[in-house]
């Protein structure tokens, strides 16, 4: 009789503990994250070989829908590298924050969007999601932004692809 009573207590407790442990794992399911963006660069302070570049623009992406973004980037013009951060804001105000490292240089590829002119750069940014708000609170993931940017017209455009934890899963 005592064994039956113990199993009546231990089995539900074990199920409860397993369910609690499964919730954080479910919140970490990665889903595809991709889209397109366009914007305008604005050169800031230049302390050779580093130039500060601020970018603002818009785009459309999975889980974000239509969004706007602001980017701050410190570019080493000699090495063709950079580091920075982006604040991505969905139409409803939910947001994602990322940090990135970048590399880039001249390219012979055709322009990816109008307004780049004849001379532009190829830029690859590797992003890590560092936080978010709303349905992106607690978000994690990483993705790559591949874009082109004109040092003459200051236009930029490109695409991104990678993964993000399932939006809203942490709630």
Regions found by a protein language model. Give the residues of each.
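Accessible peptide chain termini
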Residues: 1-2, 143
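Sec/Tat signal peptide C-region and signal peptidase I cleavage site
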Residues: 21-27
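Cleavable N-terminal signal peptides
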Residues: 14-15, 25
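Bacterial N-terminal signal peptides that target proteins for export
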Residues: 2-13
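Beta-strand-enriched cores of mature, soluble protein domains
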Residues: 27-171
